[in-house]
């Protein structure tokens, strides 16, 4: 996790992102970049009643909290993001509890609850070239959930 003493310019954060991921930085159409020198940056867009988080670089917990506050202020029902890490350590990192696991053709879907009892769903998105599975993450902002298509 980044600390507040690691201030960087936006270009320095982009360079850090590119070195860490091996990906070239780009911001998709419709996404807005939020940046703070000592926190990094996040790319966020609204899609209907969901706030989508595309890239986060820097203090991930800060940007998650920022996105949750922003989504709530905008009247969104859920946060949507992508998990490129192993799902179970990712779930533990956020303090979520797995309530149910589904296995379909060797791909797992994880139904979780956060510390406030709200639903979180990790669903397989695609398989990377190295064989790792990338997941869609839907975190509902109220107890219960709405259906998002």
Name each model-derived stretch.
Residues 1-23, 132, 137, 148:
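Short amphipathic alpha-helix that is part of the acyltransferase structural core
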Residues 2-4, 30-31, 93-98, 120-122:
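Short glycine-aromatic motifs
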Residues 18-49, 124:
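A conserved beta-strand-loop-helix scaffold within acyl/acetyltransferase catalytic domains
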Residues 27-28, 45-52, 102-106, 126-133:
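Short, ordered beta-strand-loop transition motifs
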Residues 47-106:
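Acyl-donor binding region in acyl/amide transferases
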Residues 55-60, 113-117, 138-145:
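Secondary-structure transition/turn motif
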Residues 97-114, 119-129:
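Conserved catalytic-core motifs of GNAT/GCN5-like acyltransferases
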Residues 121-144, 148:
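A cross-taxonomic marker for long C-terminal extensions/tails that follow the last structured domain
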């Amino acid at each position: 996790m980044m600390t507040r003493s690691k201030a960087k310019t936006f270009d320095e954060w982009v360079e850090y992102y590119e070195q860490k991921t091996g990906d070239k930085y780009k911001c998709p159409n419709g996404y807005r970049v939020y940046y703070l020198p000592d926190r990094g940056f996040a790319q966020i867009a609204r899609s209907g009643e969901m706030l989508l988080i595309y890239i986060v670089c820097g203090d991930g917990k800060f940007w998650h909290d920022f996105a949750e506050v922003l989504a709530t202020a905008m009247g969104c029902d859920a946060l949507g993001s992508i998990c490129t890490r192993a799902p179970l350590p990712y779930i533990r990192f956020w303090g979520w509890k797995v309530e149910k696991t589904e296995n379909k053709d060797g791909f797992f879907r994880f139904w979780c609850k956060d510390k406030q009892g709200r639903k979180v769903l990790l669903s397989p998105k695609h398989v990377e070239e190295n064989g790792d599975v990338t997941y869609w993450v839907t975190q509902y902002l109220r107890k219960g959930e709405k259906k998002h298509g």
